[in-house]
């Protein structure tokens, strides 16, 4: 089944992304702002962090372009602002498609949690999908490289400050551990039934 967005994300020519303003509980206030402009007290922007994991329990990461204002050249997960009129699920699907050319279906998406980070309401998702790196189409102003890494590799990269330290990282690790336990349990049940 194909998932389509009924409207194009709102962008004005010559300006940044137009985003909804939220309250601390994640409710839209009915107001918008141009990304990069300051927010008043009690105003927040919704962002998504998308953790793509494959069947080998590896995580797909991307190296931020050297043109980026924030954290240029740093390895990170796939993330971005939820645009005005867009849901966080739509942003979760849109951001990786724009940045690296991966097509994600809603059935592959698991909402992990929401965390408050300053003025950011960060909705965190895990996407279960295998992806051939040779199929990547990089958005040059955003991404300079992509690669699959193990959790162990990622921990080492974070300790060397090569990978951005996300507050939800250990929630993603827990998700992978629980997924591995479910796989092992199914495998054991299959062997017992033979």
Stretches found by the model and what they are:
Residues 47-79:
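A glycine-rich, hydrophobic loop/mini-helix early in the fold
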Residues 60-61, 77-110:
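The catalytic Nudix box helix
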């Amino acid at each position: 089944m194909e998932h389509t967005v009924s409207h194009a994300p709102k962008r004005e020519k010559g300006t940044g992304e137009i985003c909804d303003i939220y309250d601390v509980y994640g409710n839209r206030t009915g107001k918008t702002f141009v990304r990069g402009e300051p927010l008043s007290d009690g105003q927040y922007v919704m962002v998504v962090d998308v953790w793509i994991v494959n069947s080998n329990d590896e995580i797909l990461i991307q190296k931020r372009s050297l043109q980026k204002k924030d954290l240029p050249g740093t390895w990170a997960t796939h993330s971005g602002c939820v645009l005005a009129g867009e849901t966080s699920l739509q942003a979760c699907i849109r951001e990786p498609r724009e940045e690296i050319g991966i097509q994600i279906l809603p059935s592959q998406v698991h909402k992990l949690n929401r965390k408050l980070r300053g003025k950011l309401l960060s909705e965190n998702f895990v996407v279960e999908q295998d992806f051939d790196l040779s199929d990547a189409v990089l958005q040059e102003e955003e991404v300079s490289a992509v690669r699959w890494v193990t959790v162990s590799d990622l921990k080492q990269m974070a300790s060397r400050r090569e990978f951005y330290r996300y507050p939800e990282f250990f929630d993603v690790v827990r998700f992978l551990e629980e997924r591995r336990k479910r796989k092992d349990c199914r495998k054991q049940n299959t062997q017992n039934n033979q």
